[in-house]
From Swiss-Prot:
Functional description taken from the UniProt entry: Catalyzes the reversible transfer of the terminal phosphate group between ATP and AMP. Plays an important role in cellular energy homeostasis and in adenine nucleotide metabolism.
Presence of keyword ATP-binding: yes
Subunit description: Monomer.
Protein name in UniProt: Adenylate kinase
Name of the coding gene: adk
Family to which the UniProt record says this protein belongs: Belongs to the adenylate kinase family.
InterPro entries reported for this sequence: Adenyl_kin_sub (IPR006259), Adenylat/UMP-CMP_kin (IPR000850), Adenylat_kinase_CS (IPR033690), Adenylate_kinase_lid-dom (IPR007862), P-loop_NTPase (IPR027417)
Residues noted as binding AMP in the record, renumbered to the chain: 31, 36, 57-59, 85-88, 92, 156, 167
One GO cellular component term noted in the UniProt record for this chain: cytoplasm
Positions of region (NMP): 30-59
Broadest EC class assigned to this enzyme: transferase
Keywords associated with the record: ATP-binding, Cytoplasm, Kinase, Nucleotide biosynthesis, Nucleotide-binding, Transferase
Secretion signal span: none
Catalytic activity of the protein: AMP + ATP = 2 ADP
Length: 215
């Protein structure tokens, strides 16, 4: 099973990625992890990546595609793989296709923006312990205070509404064309399949939808 997983920040993609990788016995591949591993391994491609990163440049799509081809040739990808965070753009999707990397399924975890803002902007954290609360879904016993220590809770920068909305706008501007690309591909060639899974509900309900989509 070769899967591309799409979903906005806060859509619950990480939870479903874990389910998919465990269910199908496939690795989760992210470009960030792949770049770091290549640099650490010191392969010819890794040295090229290191040179680009050390000079403050952006690693080109060509290099990333080469890394992907190298990565998916490894034994743990024999049964497939899950791409998380790649491709992000149409040129990357086209380069992936042109490189002969076949994909079985593109899965989008879809959640309304206002729901994501509510999920993320309502989070509060106890900095010292990492305990996480939510104003609506898991409130502390005393508003703004950690249950165990009574210390103040904070809101992380990433969880502030303005930041969340900015990240969502960026995601939509990048991903909407990608969604259209894969929907057209599915309609005209039948592969990869494209499924939009509703990401609202309990974790078990969403997981059941994902499982049904990939069946």
């Amino acid at each position: 099973m070769r899967v591309i997983l799409l979903g906005a920040p806060g859509a619950g993609k990480g939870t479903q990625a874990r389910f998919i990788t465990e269910r199908f016995g496939i690795p989760q591949i992210s470009t960030g992890d792949m770049l770091r591993a290549a640099v650490k391994a010191g392969s010819p491609l890794g040295l090229k990546v290191k040179g680009v990163m050390d000079s403050g440049g952006l690693v080109s799509d060509d290099i990333i595609i080469d890394l992907i081809r190298e990565r998916i040739a490894q034994p743990d990808c024999a049964r497939g793989f899950l791409f998380d965070g790649f491709p992000r753009t149409i040129p990357q999707a086209e380069a992936l296709r042109d490189a002969g990397v076949s994909i079985d399924h593109v899965l989008e975890i879809a959640v309304d923006d206002e729901e994501i803002v509510s999920r993320m902007a309502g989070r509060r954290v106890h900095a010292a312990s990492g305990r996480v609360y939510h104003d609506l879904h898991n409130p502390p016993k005393v508003a703004g205070k950690d249950d165990e220590t009574g210390e103040d809770l904070i809101q992380r920068e990433d969880d502030k509404e303005e930041t969340v909305r900015h990240r969502l706008a960026l995601y939509h501007s990048q991903t909407k064309p990608l969604v259209d690309f894969y929907q057209r591909l599915a309609a005209t060639t039948g592969t990869p399949r494209y499924t939009r899974v509703e990401g609202i509900g309990s974790v078990s309900e969403i997981t059941a939808r994902v499982q049904a989509a990939l069946a």
